Amino acid sequence: MEAKKVTEEEEETWRREIVTSVMRLVSTRLPQTDLISLLLVSPWLYRTLISYPSIWLTINLREMTNAGDRLLAALSLPRYRQVKHINLEFAQGVVDSHLKLVKTECPDALLSLEWLNLNVCQKISDNGIEAITSICPKLKVFSIYWNVRVTDAGIRNLVKNCRHITDLNLSGCKSLTDKSMQLVAESYPDLESLNITRCVKITDDGLLQVLQKCFSLQTLNLYALSGFTDKAYMKISLLADLRFLDICGAQNISDEGIGHIAKCNKLESLNLTWCVRITDAGVNTIANSCTSLEFLSLFGIVGVTDRCLETLSQTCSTTLTTLDVNGCTGIKRRSREELLQMFPRLTCFKVHS
């Protein structure tokens, strides 16, 4: 009888200490869907998991259906009161009315939110942005990729409600104009990352607003914006901490503009795909100044030759891991073997398919 009691006590100790410790470790590595499933296994496991607030800091509804209703249901639960990340990317069934209900029914639920992804939630408009951002005072990262309903009014609401944004993705928001860039520039001097890919209504003047005020930028994505000119590109030189720059499709940039970009000597990733006016002179300037480059795409630039690669090999051979010279008809030494002779650390030779 005594032995049986000892065994039961050992089992209880094992359950309370060992299993609890294991669950604490394992739970931090499980997808949210698995965590929710584990809640249903037993009351003890439910209580154990609920007692770990650090595993309930994210609500991930990516690609889910009925996402608006799911979001409301999640935010009504006490375990999500300290949520910091919400991912609604490609989610279906989330509209302005859901975000307005979050504001009215769960006004304190997002006080700790720092990261909000609304990518491709195309039924959300300026009104939805106003509702959700009005209760997210600590928001730092906001992404609303490919939403054509968002206008300058939505960005006005964002900058009014969220004063601490450091990472902003507006890629594909084609209705935005220079006014949005003015609002961003005036409100976010500490902005570190900005993506305005395919925001085709933004002109040199709008970009200049950002470049002349957001000096902390480390990542700048200007992909598929062919309307900018050297007038704006030259001011990129003001971004002393810039690490990533994508100007794919910048048909108006010249070697002079590239020369100013080369002053950003901390650059690690530079996409010059289809920058068709660039010649060896521009690439040589980059090579001589940006000696930490790890990624460089010259795809489709017919004005560059083997000479620029020779210069690059003298300054960036120990850093470059990705180099795309496909479509550069002036470069003759572009086989895999020849490129590896000049850049032995290359692991990727093709960025564009």
UniProtKB/Swiss-Prot annotation:
SMART domains: LRR_CC (SM00367). It comes from the Eukaryota. Residues 8-56 form the F-box domain. Coiled coil: none annotated. This is F-box protein At3g58530. Pfam families: LRR_6 (PF13516). Gene3D superfamilies: Ribonuclease Inhibitor. Disulfide bonds: none annotated.
